[in-house]
Design a protein with these regions (language model features):
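Structured aminoacyl-transfer and RNA-binding surfaces used for tRNA recognition/handling
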Residues: 1-104
Length: 105
């Protein structure tokens, strides 16, 4: 079984909804929720500022701490909710239908 006390997560820096769900619904303490920049927690990386144009969204990643203290990514979620069109500002257009793309590691 996976020990929940060994889990930590990352969210995109502005994704208050994901952080709240991890904390309030799943029970991950805020001390184990890291908010990262778009180069780390947005798909494709740095899409808001650098592109490419197309479907994109913030990410959340789940990590497990091994006995050695090392952490490994065990799962990721991409909240596909925008279409990037052109350069900032105002270049992220909400998609009419949003989805969550998930994957292991």
């Amino acid at each position: 079984a996976i020990d929940p006390a060994r889990l930590s997560v990352t969210v995109y820096k502005d994704d208050d909804e994901a952080a709240k769900i991890w904390n309030e619904k799943i029970g991950i303490p805020t001390s184990r929720i890291s908010r990262l920049e778009e180069d780390e927690n947005f798909w494709p990386a740095s899409a808001p500022s650098q592109g490419p144009d197309g479907v994109c969204g913030p990410c959340s990643e789940i990590y497990y701490q091994l006995d050695s203290g090392k952490t490994v990514e065990i799962w990721n979620l991409v909240f596909t909710q925008f279409n990037r069109v052109g350069d900032p500002p105002d270049n992220l257009r909400p998609l009419p239908s949003k989805n969550i793309d998930t994957g292991m590691g």
